Amino acid sequence: NVLPSAQYWDHWTIETFAYTAWTHRPLGVMVLDLAYRTGVPWNESHFDNAKFNSLMDTADATLDVAKRKLVLKQVEELMQEEGPIVQPVWRAVFTGVNKRVKGFKMHPTNYFFCEEWSV
């Protein structure tokens, strides 16, 4: 059953199967906090895991990037074991830039910050 966007978003957390693209969050922990913590409104998978919540508390409180990566490794292993989601696709991102364009770097959110470029 395919619904128009306006109707889909009224039901997306209660459907048996839904496809959601989680994008445009500066930190990986943000998506996990929004989508998989017990009881949060956008937890469409209804994932409920005390160890996950505890690890996320630790990750959120860890400012050192290298240390946070170690905690998030445990989070990802737990999610792979528990299976709250299925990763159906990996989005390919391609960018073409002329060599005359200086200062261009692909941003992780796929936004283009044109004020940083020059020709």
Regions picked out by a protein language model, each given a short descriptive name:
Residues 8-119:
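Detector for C-terminal structural segments
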